[in-house]
Structure formats: structure tokens, C-alpha cells
């Protein structure tokens, strides 16, 4: 626009809203503002009495700083809660923390340099509590810095006395229904952590293990197998051979007895070719053939112990690998244990809590199990029982806490019997909406196939298992009275009291053993699995808090929680209530780099959200979260974050343009009714209305990437590239009180008021900043206190949409023609052009009904002629039929004020450098 004596007559944008966001400095100021007005309480008061939407927070672990996975999770939750609280719901959000468990124990040990076995239990637990609470406070501030709104002053903690008290009641109710039992079973065991693990605490990684073929000499062939034969097994865990008591065959498979180099071997016929190739058997002779069931109860010698190994039958045997004759150690495998129970095999597990062999393993005593592989192989070789030893890389279970390989180990543990409520849990799954829908099958299959839940842990920092044992007969005691007593004690004192008091002090007065009548008891020393802690949160949080209710509307966590929190919560809820604790379950993927790799310090691809917030601002991270289809793994890198920052800049500039052009607009006095708006203005409201409908549906469907792309496209294309571009002359050059200018300002005002609300769930900080410049006296103090914009059927004018769609199609042809003319130096700015549109009759009729073509195309003159008169050089655009455009340099003088070239420039003697429109405006302004 003009730079000269008429500058002061232009309505140039005026706003204090800065172009540069400066988010790292601005956002903390907004956080302070929210704290000062107590935004969470204000919103709860506003929404009191409305229908509720309860998103129950899955508790993050109180250990370390937050990472991008936390960011993705918490921002997704915050987007949902903010949307719900602005769209007619009472949507409280109570953040929580998982505060017990092994990692906190390990950190307390590491930080203090103490030996937990030599430290007073209560003192050690105090150190653990201090560590957990320290990181609760650290993470709390980090989550708040992301703009996440919640009841940060009163979160739920699994270590709080109230939570622990209710958890005891959950355990007691499950025990009362017969779902809790103690049994000897193989469980996942971590020797490094010295405790049992649940399935949810196990992850699988690649591991190189031995791969050996071993001979078991036949001792008693039961008249079927010759006594000079050998049964061949294959295993990748030689360390389990000291616990071998059986060899399992499939009853329906064919087995062959063959002779190789003077020795007779038994193996499955279906694996003969593979084994022969592996062992280098060039010449062998098949001597006999059997069904697996014919070989049942044949007895073999153990390869190096004076012990029998019984041939048993099991459906779990496959022909995928090995020999079809499966080494069976009931003390070290689930299938082995079950088949061993069926045949009465001895359960041998000669391994201590640290994963080292006991005296029962004889010559291997003291060896760490994984280190013992070499010694076992040497023993087999010495006894000529080894056919081959090699290595294999395969998936192996690891402890997800310490990242060390784990073992199966038969020990006495407390279990929750999934069989007791499995069918009810499977039925409950189909009452829940799973987002994405594949989540249903995933958890259904896990519940259907999972074994009983090992809920005991041999550690210190956790909620004790509230069981007493009779000193006289050893029977366990748990009943309504003991549970009520322990629950009350925990509510008043926390679970430390279990370790500080004797059994007699913890039990109700007058307790006696229900089995033998004894009156002296000892306490259970194990604690509960932390998944039982968080799995009880629906009872410990949703039930007692007045602002919440059971069940919740939504659980939202990473896809690994189908086997974790979703699973444990479903189990406890179905066991107690017979129903799921949630109505919807939404899962997101993991954060990966641009190549799809996990975040890893060794790969150097870790993106730190705290650093990103310090450098770029939390709103950029929030926009990144919204831009991704979180149902898959979510990619992040400096380049991707840069793209989010660029998208943010465009959205911010759009809002700044609107704010700048509303500086002299009073919506209370100057609004223009819809019927008096120009067709272009009505088109803008139509596009806004469609945006409101699309964005609202996308929020309802949790498709936040659709929200992002719709808003971004609206700002950059519909507004910046089209509406604003066309509007600038009217806004800047018309008389300030011009009716058409006020009409445009009315539309801009409605657009920004809708945009600022729809942006709030995502751009929490920037929307608040925008609102601070937009709000009028008497309006809501915070943008978060506003209501969601409503669609308006009056704006859905199909005729306008169709007509403007065609006109904008033509605008593309004109733009292309202007670009070509500019490249040929025919014109400079588009206002230096006259255009001639050669149109078909259909186009001619449409364009004659369209006012202000010059303004739409931003040229000085637009002339309409029949298509038949088009010269050969007139430009046509592929896909746009019936239109050709010619561009020529405009003739006449350029208006100094608006830059339009037209013949009226010079006609006004007082303002000879202005066009007629500008001369009249200036005259009015100067009085």
C-alpha cells in the first residue's frame, strides 16, 4: 500500500498481538495467570450440574523426568478434557501417579548406597516414599508446563493411605469370591531384581542362546522302544536340564526310530529331514515307526543325573523346530508344569532368588543360571550325550525394569485366578468401545489366553498382601474382619504400619485360626504387584471422589496397556463388579523417529520435550501431537517439529490479521446482519460453518489430526489465500464506517471468536493470548471458560457455495495468466493488470451475477467477452472448460493511495493522484 502523504488515511491493521510468538517467555506468564484465577476450579464451578465426561488418568510412574511418550499421552488427554469442558460437559481431570515398585526401590538403593537386606524396612520404605514424592512434584511441574489442566493440588497417588486402604478392600473382595489363591507354579522371575514378574512386566528382545541336541538313553522301553536307543531333544536353555523330569511327545505325531553310525535315535518324522541336515547325517536307516501315544510312559535316563525322565504326551508339542521330543522341566516352564501335573512329575527348581543354582543342582551349585549353560554343555560332552552345540539368535523374555534376561521358576506365589472370571471379562470387553477397533481383539485374545495373574512380589516398597498365617498349622487367614481391620489401619496410618507392627497388633482382637483354632499368627512378607495398585484405581479414585463416578467414560494410554493397565483394571473390576470400569478405551502408538525407530540415546534420536518447550514453546509440541494420527506410531524429529512450528506461524498470522483489522470495530453497535453481507462475506461464513461442523465431529471422534489439518487449511487457504487477499482493499482503503467494511469486520469477528475456541484444546497458551486481545469488558476472563461455537443452518447456502466454487476455479486461471504476464514483464503487481475473460454462455451468466470481479481477482479492470472472440494466445487451464483469459498492462495512472490503475485518477483537482473512490474517502475524512 501507499507510503506517503495519504498513509494516515488508510485503515491499516492495529494490534498489540505480536507477530513473534516468543512462546518460551510468554507461556510461563499465562501459566501464572491460570494459577492466579484458579482456572481448574473456575471451570468446575461453571460446569457443575452438567452431564459428566470422566477421563480416568492412567498413572505414570514417579521416576525420572517426562519424555515424549508422556507428552503425547498427557496432551491427548488434555485435548479431550478441554474440548468436553467447553462443549457442555462437566469433565474433571484428576491426574495420578504410580508410586510403588521396583524401579523406585532400585533408585533409593542407588542414591543412598544402602543394602535393602540390612536396612530397617520402615526406614527403607521412607527413602522410597521420599524418592517417589520428589518425582511426583518434578513431573507435576513438567506436565503443567505443557499446558495440561487438572486438579494438580489434589492428584491421586497409589502410596496415599486412602488409596492403599481401598486397594486392601479390593484384594479382600476378590479373596472372598475365591479368586485369590497361593500355589506352586512357574512364574517369570528376575534374578537381578529378586522377584516374580507379571506378564505385563516382561518384554521380548533378541538374545543369542546355545542351541543343543541332547541324547536321553532309554531305560525302560515298555516293550516298544529298544533299551539301546536314545530319545533326542533340542533346547536353547541348557541350564534347565538339571531340572528335567520328562520328555513330551505329541500323541498324534509320527515318530521314527532310525540308526545312524551305529546308534539308534527317536525323533518326529516331520522333523527328520531338518535334524538330519543340522546334524550332518548323510546315511541313516529307519528301523521303526510309532504314533506318539504308543510311546507314553517309556522311561529314559537323565543324561547326567541319577534320575528318570518319563515320556509324556502333550498337545503343545509342534513341528516348527527341534525334534518333536520336548525336554520337560516342570519347575521352569508353564506347559512343562501343566503336563507334569497330569503325569505326577516332580517339580524341581534348583534356583534361588538371585538366579543361582542351589545344592539341589549338585555340581552346578552357585552358578548363575545363564552362566551355567557352558558348564552343562561341557558335562553333556564329557558323558557323550551331546550331539551338537551351536548358537541361535531368538526372541527372549527380559525384565522391563532392569533389562536383564529372566527365567521361569516354580515358586510359591499368590495368584488371582483369571479362570474364575475369564468369561465375564470376555463378555465385558464387548460392552466397551475400543479405539482403534483392533484394540478389542487384542485385549480379548490376551484375556482369553492368559494364565493366572501372579500378584505377589518379593520386595519391600509396595502394598502388603493382607494375609496372616497360623503359627500352629501354617494355614492362611483372611476374612471380612481382618480385611476391614487392615483397611482401617492403612487409611489412618498408611501401609507402613504393616511392617512396623506385629501380626497381633494388626489383627482384630480375639482372632483364631479357622483350621486348628490357633491364636498366634505371622504376617505375609510379600507385597502386591504394582499392576494390582493401578488396577485398583477405578475403585480407589472414581468411587470415593465426589466429582467423579464409576465407571469412567474413558481410559487413554499407549497400546502396550492392553496387557497392562487396561487388563489389570478390567480384571479387578469384573471380579468385583462384574463390569468393565470404562466405557471407551483409546490407545495411541509409540513415539519413533522419522525412520520408525524407537527413541534411543545410543541412536542419538531422542527428542527431549523439556528442551523443546524451553526453546520453542509447549504449543509447538501440542500442535505436533494434534497433527499426528496417534493410532499408529507417531514420528518425531527436529525436522517434523520444525514443520509444526511453521504451521503454528501460519495459524498465528491468520489470527493476528483478524485482530489487527478489528481495532475499530464495536460488535455491540456495528454488527451487520447476515442478509446485508456481500456474497463473499456469506461464503466466508459458509466456510466457517462447515469448519465448525467438521472440527466438532473430529473432536467427538478423537480424530485430532483432522482438527489440525482442517484448521490449518482454513487459515492458510480459505482465509489467507482467498478471503483476506480479496478483503484487504475494502478493509484498508474504504471509509472507516463504510457499510461493506463493517460487514467484513462482522464476519472477521465471528471467525476469530469461533477459531479461538476451537484452537483452545490444542493451542492452550496461544488461544489464551489471542483471547486477551479479543475479549471485551464483561466477557469470560479466560478463553477456557467460553462455550463451543454452534453451527448455523442459515449459513449453509448451497447456491453461494456452488457459485463461489466456480468463481474461485476461474481465479486459479486468472492467477496463472497473471503469473505468465509477470514473468514476461508485461505487468508487475496484479493491480497493474487489465484482464479480459472470454467465457462460454454458462460462465458468462454466472460471472454477470457476481459482483466485484476486479476485487476478487485483485486487478484494476476485469472485462467479460464471449469465448468465441478469444485470441489464440489467450490462456486456458486444463480441467477448466469454457474459460480463456488475456492479460494486458493497465492503461491510466496509478492511485497513490490504493494502487489501482484507472482513468478517474487525476479527475479530482484537490487530490489529483487519487482515484475517485479514494478522493471521496479522503475528502470525508478531512471534513
Swiss-Prot record:
E.C. designation(s): 6.1.1.5
Report the cofactors.
Zn(2+)
State the compartments where it is located.
Answer: Cytoplasm
Annotated residues that bind Zn(2+) are located at: 895, 898, 915, 918
For the ligand (ATP), the binding residues are 601
Sites where the protein binds L-isoleucyl-5'-AMP: 557
What domain of life is recorded for the organism? Bacteria
Return the broad EC class. Answer: ligase
| Intervals of motif 'KMSKS' region | 598-602
Q: Does the keyword Transport apply?
A: no
Question: Could you describe the subunit structure of this protein?
Answer: Monomer.
Q: What job does the chain carry out?
A: Catalyzes the attachment of isoleucine to tRNA(Ile). As IleRS can inadvertently accommodate and process structurally similar amino acids such as valine, to avoid such errors it has two additional distinct tRNA(Ile)-dependent editing activities. One activity is designated as 'pretransfer' editing and involves the hydrolysis of activated Val-AMP. The other activity is designated 'posttransfer' editing and involves deacylation of mischarged Val-tRNA(Ile).
Q: What is known of its domains?
A: IleRS has two distinct active sites: one for aminoacylation and one for editing. The misactivated valine is translocated from the active site to the editing site, which sterically excludes the correctly activated isoleucine. The single editing site contains two valyl binding pockets, one specific for each substrate (Val-AMP or Val-tRNA(Ile)).
| This protein's name | Isoleucine--tRNA ligase
According to its UniProt entry, this protein's organism is Syntrophomonas wolfei subsp. wolfei (strain DSM 2245B / Goettingen)
Amino acid at each position: 500500500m501507499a507510503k506517503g502523504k495519504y498513509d494516515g488515511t488508510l485503515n491499516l491493521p492495529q494490534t498489540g498481538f505480536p507477530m513473534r510468538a516468543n512462546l518460551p517467555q510468554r507461556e510461563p506468564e499465562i501459566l501464572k495467570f491460570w494459577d492466579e484465577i484458579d482456572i481448574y476450579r473456575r471451570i468446575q464451578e461453571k460446569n457443575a450440574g452438567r452431564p459428566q465426561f470422566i477421563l480416568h488418568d492412567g498413572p505414570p510412574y514417579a521416576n525420572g523426568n517426562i519424555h515424549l511418550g508422556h507428552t503425547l499421552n498427557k496432551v491427548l488427554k488434555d485435548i479431550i478434557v478441554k474440548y468436553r469442558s467447553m462443549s457442555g460437559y462437566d469433565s474433571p481431570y484428576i491426574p495420578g501417579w504410580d508410586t510403588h515398585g521396583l524401579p523406585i526401590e532400585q533408585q533409593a538403593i542407588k542414591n543412598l548406597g544402602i543394602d535393602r537386606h540390612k536396612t530397617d524396612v520402615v526406614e527403607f520404605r521412607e527413602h522410597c516414599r521420599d524418592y517417589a514424592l520428589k518425582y511426583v512434584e518434578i513431573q507435576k511441574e513438567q506436565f503443567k508446563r505443557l499446558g495440561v489442566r487438572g486438579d494438580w493440588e489434589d492428584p491421586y497417588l497409589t502410596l496415599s493411605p486412602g488409596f492403599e486402604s481401598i486397594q486392601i478392600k479390593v484384594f479382600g473382595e476378590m479373596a472372598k469370591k475365591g479368586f485369590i489363591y497361593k500355589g506352586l507354579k512357574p512364574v517369570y522371575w528376575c534374578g537381578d531384581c529378586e522377584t516374580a514378574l507379571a506378564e505385563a512386566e516382561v518384554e521380548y528382545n533378541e538374545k543369542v542362546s546355545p542351541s543343543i541336541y541332547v541324547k536321553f538313553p532309554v531305560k525302560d522301553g515298555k516293550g516298544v522302544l529298544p533299551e539301546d536307543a536314545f530319545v533326542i531333544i533340542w533346547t536353547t536353555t541348557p541350564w534347565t536340564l538339571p531340572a528335567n523330569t520328562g520328555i513330551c511327545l505329541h500323541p498324534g505325531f509320527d515318530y521314527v526310530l532310525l540308526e545312524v553310525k551305529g546308534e539308534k535315535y527317536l525323533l518326529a518324522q516331520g522333523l527328520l529331514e531338518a535334524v538330519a541336515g543340522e546334524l550332518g547325517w548323510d546315511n541313516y536307516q529307519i528301523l521303526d515307526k510309532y504314533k506318539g501315544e504308543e510311546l507314553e510312559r517309556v522311561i529314559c535316563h537323565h543324561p547326567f543325573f541319577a534320575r528318570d525322565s518319563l515320556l509324556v504326551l502333550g498337545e503343545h508339542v509342534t513341528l516348527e523346530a527341534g525334534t518333536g521330543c520336548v525336554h520337560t522341566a516342570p519347575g521352569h516352564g508353564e506347559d512343562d508344569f501343566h503336563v507334569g501335573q497330569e503325569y505326577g512329575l516332580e517339580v524341581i527348581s534348583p534356583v534361588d532368588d538371585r538366579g543361582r543354582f542351589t545344592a539341589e543342582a549338585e555340581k552346578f551349585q552357585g552358578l548363575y543360571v545363564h552362566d551355567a549353560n557352558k558348564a552343562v554343555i561341557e558335562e553333556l560332552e564329557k558323558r557323550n550325550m551331546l550331539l551338537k552345540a551351536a548358537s541361535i539368535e531368538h526372541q527372549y523374555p527380559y525384565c522391563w525394569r532392569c533389562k536383564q534376561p529372566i527365567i521361569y521358576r516354580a515358586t510359591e506365589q499368590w495368584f488371582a485366578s483369571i479362570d474364575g472370571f475369564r468369561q465375564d471379562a470376555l463378555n465385558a470387553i464387548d460392552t466397551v468401545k475400543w479405539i482403534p477397533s483392533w484394540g478389542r481383539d487384542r485385549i480379548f485374545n490376551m484375556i482369553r489366553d492368559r494364565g493366572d495373574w501372579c500378584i505377589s512380589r518379593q520386595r519391600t516398597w509396595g502394598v502388603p498382601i493382607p494375609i496372616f498365617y497360623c503359627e500352629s498349622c501354617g494355614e492362611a487367614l483372611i476374612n471380612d474382619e481382618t480385611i476391614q481391620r487392615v483397611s482401617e489401619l492403612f487409611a489412618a496410618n498408611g501401609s507402613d504400619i504393616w511392617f512396623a507392627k506385629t501380626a497381633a497388633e494388626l489383627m482384630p482382637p480375639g482372632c483364631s485360626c479357622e483350621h486348628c483354632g490357633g491364636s498366634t499368627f505371622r504376617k505375609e512378607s510379600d507385597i502386591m504387584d504394582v499392576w494390582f495398585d493401578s488396577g485398583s484405581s477405578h475403585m480407589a479414585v472414581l468411587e470415593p471422589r465426589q466429582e467423579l463416578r464409576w465407571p469412567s467414560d474413558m481410559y487413554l494410554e499407549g497400546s502396550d496397556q492392553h496387557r497392562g493397565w487396561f487388563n489389570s483394571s478390567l480384571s479387578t473390576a469384573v471380579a468385583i463388579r462384574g463390569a468393565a470400569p470404562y466405557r471407551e478405551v483409546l490407545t495411541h502408538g509409540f513415539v519413533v523417529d522419522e525412520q520408525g525407530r524407537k527413541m534411543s540415546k545410543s541412536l542419538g534420536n531422542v527428542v527431549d520435550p523439556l528442551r523443546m518447550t524451553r526453546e520453542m514453546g509447549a504449543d509447538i509440541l501440542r500442535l505436533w501431537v494434534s497433527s499426528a494420527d496417534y493410532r499408529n506410531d507417531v514420528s518425531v524429529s527436529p525436522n517434523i517439529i520444525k514443520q509444526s512450528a511453521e504451521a503454528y506461524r501460519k495459524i498465528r498470522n491468520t489470527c493476528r490479521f483478524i485482530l489487527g483489522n478489528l481495532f475499530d470495530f464495536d460488535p455491540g453497535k456495528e454488527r451487520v446482519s447476515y442478509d446485508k453481507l456481500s456474497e463473499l462475506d456469506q461464503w466466508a461464513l459458509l466456510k466457517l460453518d462447515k469448519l465448525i461442523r467438521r472440527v466438532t465431529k473430529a473432536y467427538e471422534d478423537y480424530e485430532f489430526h483432522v482438527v489440525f489439518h482442517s484448521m490449518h487449511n482454513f487459515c492458510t487457504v480459505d482465509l489467507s489465500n482467498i478471503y483476506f487477499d480479496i478483503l484487504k482493499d475494502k478493509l484498508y482503503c474504504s471509509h472507516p464506517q463504510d457499510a461493506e467494511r463493517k460487514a467484513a469486520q462482522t464476519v472477521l469477528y465471528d471467525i476469530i471468536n469461533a477459531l479461538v475456541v476451537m484452537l483452545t484444546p490444542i493451542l492452550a497458551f496461544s488461544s489464551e493470548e489471542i483471547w486477551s486481545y479479543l475479549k471485551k469488558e464483561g466477557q469470560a476472563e479466560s478463553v477456557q471458560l467460553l462455550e463451543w461455537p454452534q453451527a448455523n443452518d442459515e449459513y449453509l447456502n448451497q447456491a453461494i457455495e456452488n457459485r463461489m466454487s466456480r468463481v474461485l476455479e476461474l481465479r486459479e486461471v486468472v492467477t496463472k495468466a497473471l503469473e505468465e504476464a509477470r514473468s514476461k514483464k508485461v505487468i508487475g503487481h496484479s493491480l497493474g493488470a487489465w484482464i479480459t475473460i472470454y467465457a462460454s454462455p454458462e460462465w458468462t451468466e454466472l460471472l454477470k451475477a457476481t459482483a466485484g470481479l476486479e476485487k476478487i481477482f485483485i486487478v484494476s479492470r476485469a472485462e467479460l467477452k464471449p469465448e468465441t472472440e478469444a485470441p489464440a494466445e489467450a490462456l486456458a487451464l486444463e480441467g477448466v472448460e469454457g474459460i480463456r483469459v488475456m492479460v494486458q498492462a493497465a492503461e491510466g495512472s496509478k492511485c497513490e493511495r490504493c494502487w489501482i490503475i484507472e482513468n478517474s485518477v487525476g479527475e479530482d483537482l484537490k487530490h489529483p493522484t487519487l482515484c475517485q473512490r479514494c478522493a471521496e474517502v479522503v475528502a470525508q475524512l478531512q471534513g
